[in-house]
């Protein structure tokens, strides 16, 4: 099992799909990384040579992935909260950030509905 960027990649998948298991790598980025490394996209992970793995690791060094990316995202959210922006307030209150309505929906962000005793009459 190839271990790249601290993630164990599945052996039986094509490398272009296996790279998407790394946080911060989608399909487009995976194709670009493989093109930079000179590795064909249809190769299975188990068939990679150690030289190809090293080339992929070198190409991934230019991309921000895993822990660095998670840290940057959390710092961005923290910065929005500290400056008191509208988006920061929505993050702090656990409400949708991007303008969705909350009168009826937004259950994913708001959590399970809490009934209020004595409301129905």
From Swiss-Prot:
Keywords: Ribonucleoprotein, Ribosomal protein, RNA-binding, rRNA-binding, tRNA-binding. Residues 106-121 have a biased composition (Basic residues). The keyword Manganese does not apply. It comes from the Bacteria. GO terms for molecular function: rRNA binding; structural constituent of ribosome; tRNA binding. Residues 89-121 are annotated as: Disordered. Located at the top of the head of the 30S subunit, it contacts several helices of the 16S rRNA. In the 70S ribosome it contacts the 23S rRNA (bridge B1a) and protein L5 of the 50S subunit (bridge B1b), connecting the 2 subunits; these bridges are implicated in subunit movement. Contacts the tRNAs in the A and P-sites. Belongs to the universal ribosomal protein uS13 family. This is Small ribosomal subunit protein uS13. It comes from Latilactobacillus sakei subsp. sakei (strain 23K).
């Amino acid at each position: 099992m190839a271990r790249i960027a601290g993630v164990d990649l599945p052996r039986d998948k094509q490398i272009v799909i296996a790279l998407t298991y790394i946080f911060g790598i989608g399909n487009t980025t995976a194709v670009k990384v493989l093109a930079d490394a000179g590795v064909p996209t249809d190769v299975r992970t188990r068939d990679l040579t150690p030289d190809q793995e090293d080339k992929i690791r070198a190409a991934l060094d230019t991309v921000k992935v895993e822990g660095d990316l998670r840290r940057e995202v959390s710092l961005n959210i923290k910065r929005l909260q500290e400056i008191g922006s509208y988006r920061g307030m929505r993050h702090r209150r656990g409400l949708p950030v991007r303008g969705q309505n909350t009168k009826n929906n937004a259950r994913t962000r708001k959590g399970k509905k809490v009934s209020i005793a004595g409301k129905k009459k």
